[in-house]
Regions:
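A structural signal for isolated positions on well-ordered beta-strands in alpha/beta enzyme cores
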Residues: 47, 70, 127-129, 273
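Acidic/histidine-rich catalytic neighborhood of metal-dependent amide-processing enzymes
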Residues: 104, 108-172
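Hydrophobic/aromatic beta-strand patches that form the interior of the parallel beta-sheet core
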Residues: 69-71, 129, 152-154, 173, ...
Length: 368
């Protein structure tokens, strides 16, 4: 089936421009300004939604329309690993650069078909939301759902074009240990909070691998208080835990608390704690109903394999779901490329995603 997105040059140029704008979380100003001007230039009724600190979301909401679905992309990226690898680099079909997969490829893939329909005179019952802050607190999406409600959302996170009707849950954990500051030459085994925390981390790792192997855990940060030539007073670690949509996350949290309590009983010198900073439940949507059928039809007509999967990371979809919005993730690129040193996305996939969204929007125009 031929491409529905006629202006492939414009799509590729937009993707290149987005990658070339450095936009780590908290510093999205330049990319917001660029896209605001870009959408205004093409006569879309774009507006800024302030989220605090001079930061903003970009929204296009057709006036006098009952919105059926919102297309969501996040404009921020993680911080750069290497400043020399910031800019866009093209190797035939492969487009490299920070945010190429997560998720500037996805942003381009929803902006171009939306823009194409407007240029053709259509006013679909579809909103466009380009949000800030997804990589950290999700403050852009939190602000979005305070003011707006949509029945459905499509999020262009990297899913290798697999439609994701289900989504993993997520727990962000902090564990801490405290001790007594003393001269380094007087340190005795077992009373250093760093050692105490390492013993707890080993125990938690054993729990995850032996008792809950279905969970995906990551020890993200480990740091102690600055102490110089002395025993540090505190040590902290941050963990990410992802779990399947049906996992008993309440029971998992209790089991983790019990492990810390047991550690205290077995080691009187251990002064530690565990806290759950963020808890997002997973969800499962049935692959039926209007949007599922429309999407299946698009895949059939484009001869694409219909292989739904569960999205295995946390994302703004968790926040949309908690706000009563039904999110489906579908985008170009894969999580295996996201946040990597040589992040990349296939332009062929970006184009394919853009065609899928073009056809999906067209089907909604026909149902008005």
């Amino acid at each position: 089936m031929p491409s529905a997105v006629e202006n492939q040059v414009r799509l590729r140029t937009l993707l290149r421009d987005l990658i070339n704008i450095y936009s780590p979380t908290g510093k999205e100003h330049a990319i917001v300004e660029f896209l605001f001007s870009y959408l205004r230039k093409h006569s879309l009724p774009v507006k800024l939604q302030q989220i605090g600190g001079g930061r903003a979301n970009l929204l296009v909401i057709p006036p006098e329309k009952e919105i059926a679905v919102v297309l969501v992309g996040h404009l921020d990226t993680v911080a750069a690993h290497d400043l020399d690898l910031l800019t866009c680099r093209e190797k035939d079909d492969l487009i490299e650069g920070l945010g190429a997969a997560d998720m500037k490829g996805g942003c381009a893939a929803i902006v171009e078909p939306y823009l194409a329909h407007w240029k053709q005179g259509r006013r679909p019952p579809v909103a466009l939301a380009l949000v800030s802050g997804e990589e950290e607190e999700g403050d852009g999406t939190r602000t979005l759902v305070k003011e707006y409600r949509f029945p459905w959302a499509f999020i262009a996170e990297p899913s290798n074009l697999h439609p994701c009707f289900s989504h993993y849950g997520y727990i962000e954990i902090r564990i801490s240990a405290t001790g007594k500051r003393m001269h380094a030459s007087l340190a005795t085994g077992g009373k250093n909070p760093v050692e105490a925390l390492l013993r707890l981390l080993i125990r938690l790792s054993r729990y995850f691998t032996e008792e809950r192997p279905e969970l995906v855990y990551n020890i993200r940060d480990l740091s102690s208080s600055r102490s110089g030539f002395a025993v540090p007073e505190t040590c902290d670690a941050s963990l990410d835990v992802h779990f399947a949509p049906t996992a008993p996350f309440g029971a998992i949290m209790m089991e983790l608390e019990e492990i810390v309590a047991e550690q205290k009983k077995q080691d009187a010198s251990f002064n530690g704690s565990i806290s759950f900073l963020n808890v997002h439940s997973g969800y499962e949507l049935p692959q039926q109903g209007e949007f599922a059928e429309k999407l299946k039809r698009v895949y059939e007509e484009r001869q694409l394999p219909w292989e739904p999967q569960a999205f295995p990371s946390h994302s703004d979809a968790n926040l949309l779901w908690a706000a009563g919005i039904k999110p489906i993730i579908l985008g170009p690129g894969g999580l295996e490329q996201a946040h990597s040193l040589h992040e990349s996305v296939s332009f062929e996939q970006v184009l394919a995603a853009s065609n899928i969204y073009y056809d999906l929007i067209a089907s909604l125009c026909g149902s008005e």
